[in-house]
Amino acid sequence: MESQQLHQNPHCPHGSAYASVTSKEVPSNQDPLAVSASNLPEFDRDSTKVNSQEETTPGTSAVPENHHHVSPQPASVPPPQNGQYQQHGMMTPNKAMASNWAHYQQPSMMTCSHYQTSPAYYQPDPHYPLPQYIPPLSTSSPDPIDSQDQHSEVPQAKTKVRNNVLPPHPHTSEENFSTWVKFYIRFLKNSNLGDIIPNDQGEIKRQMTYEEHAYIYNTFQAFAPFHLLPTWVKQILEINYSDILTVLCKSVSKMQTNNQELKDWIALANLEYNGSTSADTFEITVSTIIQRLKENNINVSDRLACQLILKGLSGDFKYLRNQYRTKTNMKLSQLFAEIQLIYDENKIMNLNKPSQYKQHSEYKNVSRTSPNTTNTKVTTRNYHRTNSSKPRAAKAHNIATSSKFSRVNNDHINESTVSSQYLSDDNELSLRPATERI
């Protein structure tokens, strides 16, 4: 018969008992624990004082009979009640379904008291096997090769999430949420979840599944702490703590608004006007841009608007730059009024151009031909005569009268008649009388 001797291990923090078997025989009716404290070694006494709670060791019959030395077997010890993380108000590893989080302070153990206001998504029926994209997180970082083997055994949902996707950086400030959400949306797209994210028009290709909803909620919660979210995001999550899709929809809408703001600023900085379009159209275009920026809480002062408009003026409107260069109090309405005035003046001048061309055509040269000459002779006349000039017919009559009185005193000429008159040159007439002798 073999005997047992109980030794307390001073290095065990929870009083684990080890049973060792020796070859020395003891009477079978002796209780191995019925040993006085004086007979114990000194180090065993100290161990007995320190360890107030001891676990019962198995009886003599529980030790197998073996004449050889048996290796000590540690007894089961309950884990400590107070660990490193408190379990109240935290996600358990079985509830976390995130990707590659072990390197980001183990978000499965992060506090999320602001989000967990309802057990709708994280306390399912225990008989319902919740499929996961990846295995639950552990306290140690998994080996990359082992993690790939584990991923292959996990049942996949409708959309297969890509492994080894780089997570987004943690959200750090309320002002940078619009920038952070771009990285978060890119992270979801790289995880093959881009078809459940709303596009620029707010439309989605399909409805997300329960597992995808939980996956998006976990990732958003882990990397965007509640106290760092903007006010409008907090208002949405206070109504429905898991409505991350609405947050994404409004974020995309705000992105489009920001893009429109950028386009409006570019259009306002590149304004050009030379009078090719009406002044009213130009005023409406500029006013629409300024009003749209004002609706987005961006106020454009009159001075800034006038400076941008003056920079783009050209042609007849360019002189307004010098006029407004020394002005300190610029009014946008006054600038539009002066642009309208110059446009109207140019329009009136353009309407008068055809009548001026018609008056100028009256001064053009007019040709006239002589019918009685063999060779056509072209004469040039001006229709606008002076008051001192006389008609050509009156000149011819005066010349004929004077020649008649000169022939009366001539005795050799009995009768004379003018048979024909020819135009010899441009300024005077020549008479060729024909005389008949009896």
Swiss-Prot record:
Its main location: cytoplasm. Homotrimer. InterPro entries: TYA. It is found in: Cytoplasm. Keywords: Cytoplasm, RNA-binding, Transposable element. The C-terminal RNA-binding region of CA is sufficient for all its nucleocapsid-like chaperone activities. Residues 369-381 have a biased composition (Low complexity). Residues 19-39, 49-60 have a biased composition (Polar residues). GO terms for cellular component: cytoplasm. GO terms for biological process: viral translational frameshifting. It comes from Saccharomyces cerevisiae (strain ATCC 204508 / S288c) (Baker's yeast). One of its GO terms (molecular function) is RNA binding. Capsid protein (CA) is the structural component of the virus-like particle (VLP), forming the shell that encapsulates the retrotransposons dimeric RNA genome. The particles are assembled from trimer-clustered units and there are holes in the capsid shells that allow for the diffusion of macromolecules. CA also has nucleocapsid-like chaperone activity, promoting primer tRNA(i)-Met annealing to the multipartite primer-binding site (PBS), dimerization of Ty2 RNA and initiation of reverse transcription. Residues 1-88, 365-397, 419-438 are annotated as: Disordered. The lineage of its organism: Eukaryota, Fungi, Dikarya, Ascomycota, Saccharomycotina. Residues 295-397 are annotated as: RNA-binding. Retrotransposons are mobile genetic entities that are able to replicate via an RNA intermediate and a reverse transcription step. In contrast to retroviruses, retrotransposons are non-infectious, lack an envelope and remain intracellular. Ty2 retrotransposons belong to the copia elements (pseudoviridae). This is Transposon Ty2-OR2 Gag polyprotein. The record marks H397, N398 as: Cleavage.
